[in-house]
């Protein structure tokens, strides 16, 4: 399960997710990727489940890059606890994802294999995603090797 080794602040505020992703929205390493089309918190368990689904489908072939990292702690109070008495303890970690963010990248597989692997992975994620290729970014005129 992904989580930071150490953090500056143990508890953080929730914040809000406005606008589109300005970083991590291009394919940097692979040839194929899935891109978020809506905003959400993605937990480390969901990232791991998607990674396992991709690796099961492509077996030993292909190389996978996980482009998001859960660096935000989410706190919870114990069940049946009265209001007040401070903020709860950190329970799990999430990655804040905005529309346009590239979640996973893949190379050394055919487009059909990548499309199916990412379809299986997208069922494990709480957001809608779209399949993109390096060619899509080159046609838009954007730099595909940002990052």
From Swiss-Prot:
Q: Cross-referenced Gene3D superfamilies, in alphabetical order?
A: Ribosomal protein L10e/L16
For this protein, the record's InterPro entries field holds: Ribosomal_uL16 (IPR047873), Ribosomal_uL16_bact-type (IPR000114), Ribosomal_uL16_CS (IPR020798), Ribosomal_uL16_dom (IPR016180), Ribosomal_uL16_sf (IPR036920)
What span is annotated as the signal peptide, if there is one?
none
A single Gene Ontology MF term assigned here is: rRNA binding
Q: Does the keyword tRNA-binding apply?
A: yes
- Write out the GO cellular component annotations: cytosolic large ribosomal subunit
Q: Which UniProt keywords apply?
A: Ribonucleoprotein, Ribosomal protein, RNA-binding, rRNA-binding, tRNA-binding
GO biological process entries:
translation
Q: Could you give the subunit structure recorded for this chain? A: Part of the 50S ribosomal subunit.
What is the similarity comment for this entry?
Belongs to the universal ribosomal protein uL16 family.
Known role: Binds 23S rRNA and is also seen to make contacts with the A and possibly P site tRNAs.
The protein's name in its UniProt record: Large ribosomal subunit protein uL16
Q: Which organism is it from?
A: Clostridium acetobutylicum (strain ATCC 824 / DSM 792 / JCM 1419 / IAM 19013 / LMG 5710 / NBRC 13948 / NRRL B-527 / VKM B-1787 / 2291 / W)
List the taxonomic lineage.
Bacteria, Bacillati, Bacillota, Clostridia, Eubacteriales
Source gene? rplP
């Amino acid at each position: 399960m992904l989580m930071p080794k150490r953090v500056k602040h143990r508890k953080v505020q929730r914040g809000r997710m406005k606008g589109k992703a300005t970083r991590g929205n291009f394919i940097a390493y692979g040839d194929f990727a899935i891109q978020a089309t809506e905003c959400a918190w993605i937990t480390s368990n969901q990232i791991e489940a998607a990674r396992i689904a991709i690796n099961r489908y492509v077996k030993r072939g292909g190389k996978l890059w996980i482009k998001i990292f859960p660096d935000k702690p989410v706190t919870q109070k114990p069940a049946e606890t009265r209001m007040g008495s401070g903020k709860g303890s950190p329970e799990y970690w999430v990655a804040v994802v905005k529309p346009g963010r590239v979640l996973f990248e893949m190379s050394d597989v055919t487009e059909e294999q990548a499309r199916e692997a990412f379809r299986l992975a997208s069922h494990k994620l709480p957001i809608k995603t779209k399949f993109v290729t390096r060619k899509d970014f080159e046609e838009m005129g954007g730099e595909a090797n940002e990052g």
